Amino acid sequence: MAGGGCAPPRLDGFVLTERLGTGTYATVYKAYGKRDTREVVAVKCVSKRSLNRASVENLLTEIEILKTIRHPHIVELKDFQWDSDHIYLIMEFCAGGDLSRFIRMRRILPEKVARIFLQQLACALKFLHDHNISHLDLKPQNILLSTPENPQLKLADFGFAQYMSPWDEKHVLRGSPLYMAPEMVCRQQYDARVDLWSVGVILYEALFGRPPFASRSFAELEEKIRSDRAIELPSRPPLSPDCRDLLQRLLERDPLKRISFEEFFAHPFVDMEHMPGPESFCKATNLVVEAVKKDQEGDASAALSLYCKALEYFVPALHYESDARRKEAIRTKVGQYISRAEELKALVASKSKNLLQQGNPAREILKEMAKDKPRLCAALEMASVAVAREEEGKDDGDTLELYQQSLGELLLLLAAEPAGRRRELLHAEIQTLMARAEYLKDQIKMREAQSMGKEALADSVRSSCTLQ
């Protein structure tokens, strides 16, 4: 956003124009290169007079880190210069503004849009984590968007960043209180996991329109941060089970109980495997080749599963593709694959009716034999609820979650069950439930793929992500 005040400083090779923002010891300007290319950049001008020892250390850290890393979701430091009055960081220009403004203009973001941004942020954090770098000041204001339309997230402002191994601990207060982990504010020891808390706050703000510790005064903010109460998630808007689980695990006050980096990167809501990228289309086409082969062999169930898996990559491929002609060609292919998957679904559905009838007599015998095992009874009852919901047509994520919870418990019980008739029945019941859960999972994926393909989700996400 342009601002008034004194004229921008002079920088050799560049013309500084509008002021984009002002911080504690720096002002950022939009600038144009004087060469033929007229390259557009952002120039961070740091007044030497404003620097104290701590800010000098922060600046040197930022330059050192940004000079040595290159990543598509981290703002690039192109060069740096200095004169008698200023130090200049010449950086990649991001025309889409910052994530804070993006959220504020929309009040809240749809979960699907928030997930795309989260995947990109996770991608940047994994790169930093692999290089033992912690940002320590993650907040929406430090997350820039590359363009107004179909933006790519760019992590910026590494003034507080540190080279930190997973076992390193710090004591110095860094970052912005609204987004800082409780262990930082309380001046206890902290480590790299503080960045995961900040990710949770950013995701919470994107989904609900405000950070969890939003306050009218610093005293109120401090009380909320120092409280032992668990973070409560609003009931509206409703979240998917995976999204809710991730938020709760990120916003765990106790860093020892908080989700780890490895668990975060592997979490199903983050789902880095299916984030839009240059390899999405290749992975999708490889799966289609396998699907066609299984289809020709007459294995309808395997073919359907492979088509569904391929569609999970085609959707991010659509989102990643910027060329309109290629995008339309992909969309046409996706439509054809969805049509074939629909035909296979009908074939598999007729076979699945037999599956729905399986296990009923054996299940009743197993329940009778489990009366002296309350834990087994409870797990079988949960499985029965899942089966009943599915037979009533409630073939949704809640039913699948019931299947998964009951199977998790039953598998543990099977491992401890001695040899005998009950163990045989339990093993057979688990096999039946696993088959039903797998079929239900394919049905859910199929519906999602249909929605994505037929309604051109990629374009709807793009319009949701476009700055007006």
From Swiss-Prot:
The keyword Lyase does not apply. The keyword tRNA processing does not apply. It comes from Gallus gallus (Chicken). It is found in: Cytoplasm. Its EC number is 2.7.11.1. Serine/threonine protein kinase that acts as a regulator of Sonic hedgehog (SHH) signaling and autophagy. Residues 280-348, 375-444 form the MIT domain. Gene3D superfamilies: Phosphorylase Kinase, domain 1, Phosphotransferase system, lactose/cellobiose-type IIA subunit, Transferase(Phosphotransferase) domain 1. Residues 14-270 form the Protein kinase domain. The active site is at 137 (proton acceptor). Keywords: ATP-binding, Autophagy, Cytoplasm, Kinase, Nucleotide-binding, Repeat, Serine/threonine-protein kinase, Transferase. It holds the Pfam family MIT. GO terms for biological process: autophagosome assembly; mitophagy; negative regulation of smoothened signaling pathway; piecemeal microautophagy of the nucleus; positive regulation of smoothened signaling pathway; protein autophosphorylation; regulation of autophagy; response to starvation. GO terms for cellular component: autophagosome; cytoplasm; cytosol; phagophore assembly site; phagophore assembly site membrane. Transmembrane segments: none annotated. GO terms for molecular function: ATP binding; protein serine kinase activity; protein serine/threonine kinase activity. This is Serine/threonine-protein kinase ULK3. ATP binds at residues 20-28, 44. InterPro entries: Atg1-like, Kinase-like_dom_sf, MIT_dom, MIT_dom_sf, Prot_kinase_dom, Protein_kinase_ATP_BS, Ser/Thr_kinase_AS. The lineage of its organism: Eukaryota, Metazoa, Chordata, Craniata, Vertebrata. It is an enzyme of class 2 (transferase).
